Amino acid sequence: ERKIMPVQDIKEAELVLVGIGGEMQVKLQSLKNIPNFSEKFSVLQEEQSRQWVIPFLIRYYLKQEFHPEIAGAYKKLKEILEGKNYFIVSLSSDDLIRNIGFQQERITLPCGGYEMMQCAENCREKLFQVDEELWNKVCGWIEDSISLEELKEPKCPDCGAALVMNQYGEPAYYEGGYL
């Protein structure tokens, strides 16, 4: 029988280590229930050369307002941990926990997420921030203010290979940025 630790025990603890499993991750199927997501996702799936945009589309819809149940659970956790010395290790790669107000240096996502990119070939074992100009253009396409043709796939500045989201499912996943 599994014993759940009462909130009072957490409040009395000097240090709290929180482990969050992949079950808390926003599922692709739930995103497909959002009308505009489904339409854009279908367009991208039809064109092989545009599939690199799919992770950006997913990132756009990983906002609290689209996932109130998961966001609510994280907000409750934040209340419980208020004023505590804590550290969170989350196997979820949806980055939703990063937008709740936790101290960023107290969160690690060893399976990656949607905030950093890496070379698809992992040529230099380094991470890159998602380019703000590219992100704004992708948002423009999602919001129907620019065309899909205006989006250019990001490339590694070192070797010219594609830049991909730094996530566990990538063939050359680089975990160094999260350790």
Kindly give the residue locations of the regions a language model identified.
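Conserved catalytic alpha/beta core of Sir2/sirtuin-type deacylases, generalized to analogous enzyme cores
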Residues: 1-179
